[in-house]
């Protein structure tokens, strides 16, 4: 390229990186908003965590297969149209989710199975369309960035999902805490939301309120009384696990109004009233104080969850328009030459027949053992990542006795350190390992396993360190695990070459989201039946297996262009 062409190429290269970064961040706006809406859905419709878990597992698998299918499509389709249309469809699915109760004529109360099924269908549709987010980006970046620079620049690009998730968290946090309707003066709605809370979440409140309790055996069906609901809770004590005790909690209108008055007075004075203070002021147990305060908060913001779909959906629609206006396809589409260092045999012919393209994809992806090893490794990377990301707040509060605020902060730090980890991993790959991303991945998995091992050691000895050290160790795990999360896609793109990069990333992505079978129900089953210590052992074991998988391709070349032209 001459100097003028190089300058123009550089401008378009960075334009493509920035536009696709923003575009993929918008995909997260209408992908992760469901997590923020779940508390509202539980409060208003009594949807259980089990139902959420089933839906989330299905959605994870659907997304993985969608990424694969869209990867195949992305290698044959203009990325500008592929990505912008996909984001538009995701946005429409998000908007439809918020309108579902209106369409079905369902109000506050126990949700019929029909509503859950409709929610599941809309989420599945959304995640089918979500698969059109990453594959076009993987293909474009391999066309615009030479292999020797791809790790660094794509590691920067990979921060897009963390940027999108962080901005969405701020937006949805504001929505859930400030929007919606106040139905706290409606006795009927308060009773319905009380019933929903007691039957889905009260068990944890009772367990956490008293260290002497060994296990909450059962929260019985709430019995309607004149003033509200009477709830019998059966539990055992650590001092005598064989003897089952029963305690009755009264969720009355009088108790609800007393807690609401105490909370409102504290707000007027600019104070945050803790559960212990509420229990003392209102003369009730700590468990009931926590539950009633949560019910008060939820009745003041009913319907806010809908805006967690509507506002991000509208923003994503604008993002889809922006993608259509500013994004272009390969260098050829804007009159620029292809990268010399990444040319393949398919670049030599302007018109390549389907059989030739199919044979090339078969050779570079499906018959390429390195791609299959990377896919297998991705499974273990995602098990470690999702085990911490999805279950972090739960195991930090239940197993490590952290407050919800501190646990949420720990997961946020985990995500932020992940951004730093991705960037550092990309730089190390290019400068230390000459673009061999799989070597960086190996050392990152060693670091992640060591960090989780340290966390497990501190967990077994709670008096050894402070919560700050625990959070720091977990953040270190985030720093290491996000390196492979970003680099595996880069390695797959390089090994398959730019002409099959999206297909390779689609295949690798399937294995990542197949991990939800373990990181979802697998983790929950272990925690319920054997305790959190076995969960941590399992996560460490997954990291060790991941190290061994990466070790098997230590000697692999940086990319597959020599193989493609052989």
Model feature map: region roles:
Residues 93, 107-132, 466-483:
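Hydrophobic core of transmembrane alpha-helices in multi-pass small-molecule transporters
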Residues 122-159:
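Cytoplasmic helix-loop-helix junction between adjacent transmembrane helices
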Residues 88-112, 446-463:
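C-terminal ends and interior cores of transmembrane alpha-helices
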Residues 65-105:
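Conserved MFS/SLC helix-loop-helix module at the cytosolic interface between two early adjacent transmembrane helices
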Residues 32, 60-68, 165-166, 415-423, ...:
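Residue-level signature of mid-helix packing/kink "hotspots" within the transmembrane helices
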Residues 155-177, 418, 509-519:
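Glycine-rich segments within core transmembrane alpha-helices of 12-TM secondary carriers
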Residues 34-38, 368-423, 485, 519-520:
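Extracytoplasmic gate region of multi-pass secondary transporters
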Residues 76-87, 431-446:
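Cytoplasmic membrane-interface "Motif A"-like loop-to-helix N-cap segments
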């Amino acid at each position: 390229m001459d100097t003028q062409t190089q300058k123009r190429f550089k401008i378009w290269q960075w334009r493509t990186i920035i536009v696709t970064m923003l575009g993929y961040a918008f995909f997260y706006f209408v992908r992760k908003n469901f997590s923020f809406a779940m508390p509202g859905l539980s409060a208003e419709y009594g949807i259980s965590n089990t139902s959420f878990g089933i839906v989330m597992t299905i959605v994870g698998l659907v997304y993985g297969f969608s990424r694969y299918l869209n990867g195949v499509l992305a290698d044959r389709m203009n990325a500008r149209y592929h990505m912008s249309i996909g984001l538009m469809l995701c946005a429409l699915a998000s908007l439809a989710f918020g309108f579902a109760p209106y369409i079905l004529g369902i109000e506050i109360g126990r949700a019929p199975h029909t509503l859950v099924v409709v929610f599941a269908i809309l989420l599945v549709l959304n995640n089918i369309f979500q698969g059109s987010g990453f594959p076009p980006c993987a293909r474009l970046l391999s066309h615009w960035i030479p292999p020797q620079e791809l790790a660094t620049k794509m590691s920067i690009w990979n921060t897009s999902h963390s940027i999108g998730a962080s901005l969405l968290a701020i937006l949805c946090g504001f929505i859930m805490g400030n929007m919606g309707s106040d139905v706290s003066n409606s006795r009927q709605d308060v009773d319905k939301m009380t019933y929903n809370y007691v039957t889905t979440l009260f068990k944890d409140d009772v367990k956490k309120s008293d260290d002497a309790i060994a296990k909450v055996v059962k929260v019985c069906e709430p019995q309607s009384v004149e003033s509200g609901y009477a709830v019998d809770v059966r539990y055992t004590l650590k001092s005598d696990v064989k003897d089952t005790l029963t305690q009755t909690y009264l969720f009355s209108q009088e108790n609800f109004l007393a807690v609401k008055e105490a909370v409102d007075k504290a707000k007027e004075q600019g104070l945050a009233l803790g559960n212990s203070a509420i229990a003392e002021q209102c003369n009730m147990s700590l468990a009931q104080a926590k539950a009633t305060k949560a019910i008060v908060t939820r009745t003041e913001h009913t319907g806010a969850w809908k805006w967690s779909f509507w506002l991000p959906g509208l923003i994503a629609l604008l993002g889809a328009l922006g993608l259509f206006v500013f994004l272009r396809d390969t260098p050829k589409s804007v009159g620029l030459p292809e990268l010399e260092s990444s040319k393949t045999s398919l670049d030599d012919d302007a018109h390549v027949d389907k059989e030739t393209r199919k044979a090339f994809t078969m050779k570079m992806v499906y018959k390429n053992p390195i791609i299959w090893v990377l896919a297998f490794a991705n499974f273990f990377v995602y098990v470690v990542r999702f085990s911490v990301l999805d279950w972090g707040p739960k195991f930090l509060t239940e197993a490590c006795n952290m407050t919800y605020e501190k646990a949420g902060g720990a997961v946020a730090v985990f995500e932020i350190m992940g951004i730093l980890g991705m960037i550092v991993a990309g730089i190390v790959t290019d400068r230390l390992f000459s673009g061999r991303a799989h070597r960086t991945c190996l050392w990152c998995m060693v670091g992640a396993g060591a960090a989780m091992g340290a966390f497990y050691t501190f967990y077994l000895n709670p008096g050894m360190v402070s919560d700050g050290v625990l959070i720091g160790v977990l953040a270190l795990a985030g720093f290491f695990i996000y390196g492979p999360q970003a680099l595996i896609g880069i390695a797959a793109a390089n090994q398959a070459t730019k002409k099959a990069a999206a297909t390779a990333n689609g295949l690798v992505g399937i294995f990542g989201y197949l991990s939800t079978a373990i990181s979802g129900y697998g983790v929950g089953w272990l925690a319920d039946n054997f305790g959190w210590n076995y969960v941590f052992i399992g996560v460490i074991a997954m990291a060790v297996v991941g190290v061994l998988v990466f070790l098997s391709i230590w000697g692999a070349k940086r990319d597959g262009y020599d193989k493609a032209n052989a």
